[in-house]
Every structure is written in C-alpha cells, then in structure tokens.
Amino acid sequence: MAVRIYRDKDVDLAWLKGKTCAVIGFGAQGHAHALNLRDSGMKVVVGLYRGSKSRVRAKRNRLKVFETADAVRRSDIIFLALPDTKMPAVYEKEIALNLRAGQTLLFAHGFAIYYRTIVPRKDIDVVMVAPKGLGPMVRNEFVNGRGVPGLIAVYRNRSGRAKRTALAWSKAIGCTRAGVIETTFRDETETDLFGEQAVLCGGTSALVRAGFDTLVKAGYSAELAYFECLHELKFIVDLIHESGMRGMRDLISDTAKWGELTVGPRIIDTRVQKEMRAVLRDIRSGRFAREFVREMKAGQKRYRRLRKAADGHRIEKVGRGLRALMTWK
C-alpha cells in the first residue's frame, strides 16, 4: 500500500510559533527534542521533578526548567518523554490535573494510549511523533543539517488541527528533512513491540546466544564462537542497513551467499514463523502489555531473575575480555 511521505516543503513550521512546547523528561529523546525545538526557534520549557539530576544539564543547555506541573500549566503542547513504566504515575500525579482544554499531548510511542495506561481527557488533542532513531542520532543528524525519518499519528483531533501540530513538531526536530509517514497509534505500537521482541532484541539475542552455545558445546573456543556469532554481526547489519538485503548479498562471499540461501530457512523455519505469529497475537490481544504492567507493579522479581540469567551468560564475560583488546574503539 502506497504511503504519503511528508517533507520539509509540505509542512508549515509557523504553526508552532507563539506556542509553548513542554518536554516532560530530559533523557535521550527529551534532550534531543528540546534542543532541536529550541534551535528551530520554538519556545521550549522542560518539566522535571524537584531534585532531578537532569535539571543542571537542561539549564546548561539554555533551557527553562520548571517542575512538571508548572511546565504543563505554562504550555500549549506537552511531550511526554518518559519511559512507559513511569509515564502513568507522572501523568496522574503531575499532568492530568493541570491540563486545560485545547492543549495537545504528544507521545513518541503509542504504548500508553493504545493499552490505556493513560486515558486523556476528551477536550485535548492527542498525537504521536516517533523518530525512527535513538535520541543522540536525532540530535546529531539535526545539528549536521540532516534528520532521521519519523512517524506521526493522531489519536484525538479535538481541535481539527492535531495533524498539523504533529507535522510541525516533526519538522522542528528535523524528521521531515528525511521524511515522515502517517500511521496510527495501534499500528506503531504493535509493529514496534513485535520488532523488538521477535527480531531486534529478543530474536537477535536468542539467536546469537544459541549460535555461541552450539559452537562452544561442540568443542570450539569461546573466543572463536564470540567472533563468529556476535562480533561480526555488526558488519552484516551495517551492510543491510546501508544497502538492503540484496545489497548485503552482493558484498559477501559466494560461500556466505550459498549458506544464507540454503541454511537460513532451516533456522528460521515454519515453526519459528508460527511462533512469531503467536507473539504478534499476544501483542494485539493486549496479553503482553497486561503481563508487562503486572510485572512492573508486582516488584519486577521475575524481570530481575531473567535479567540476571541473561547477564550471566558466558558470552558476556568472553565479550568483555575481547572488547578490551579492540584498541580502535
């Protein structure tokens, strides 16, 4: 299905002029959005809790800092640059009671809205601007005159101009320099979670560990297994990122190509694809979100146990030793 890509020429940045943009939180995304907005000539305030260590850093960047509730009261557009786990409590205690009709809530990810861990009042706009890059990349590309691609979505269009706000914000942080695609909160949330779980984080980590374990159990040195299953992964991912799958294939050896084409389907077979569909069902039904929220509220015991086991895998110790030898880093 063809999608429209919005670029700088399609968006009126003047729509944000005269409006106050509040960035709640000053982590990687909050830092990038706040500085890019400021450098685009927007009026920006940062909302942080009293005693936050980020206050000094924000002020050092010539940004006005207020406590969260005060920042909300002073603003027209409120960007929640907070982790999914912390966002509901901050919203309930500091944001909800200080909102007024006609303001806009802006998110970088759809989780809180789609799974209703936050339920905004009905007399405000609710939009999303999701740069497809980490915070430091969003900032660095902007500073260098470029931008990262992004997604926008409108959940509630009370004013009739919510999309205009999302596009203008996208332009102010540099995303329309590369291109912005319109989606929905549902589609962004479901595809983002699936990508993280099945491919980018869960799938890749499990595949690397399984390959490492297979070689070590077969009698090969752990160092050799690390190089072949983890270290060299970056080279292939970089090729795919820059040139696509076919471009990567053009640049690897004939031996590697034949192995990819004949053995790859044995590893990621129909059983794995069936499991991927089950993972997607859990995301779409809300089962994953319910389990995640329940675990966070219950003290994270299972999470900490799983994290400890993953962090204690032998590949971690081997990797630390080998990375120490890489003097070019």
Per-segment meaning from a language model:
Residues 19-33:
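Glycine-rich adenosine-cofactor-binding loop
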Residues 67-118:
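Rossmann-fold NAD(P) dinucleotide-binding segment
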Residues 210-213, 217-218, 243-303:
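Interdomain hinge/lid region at the active-site interface
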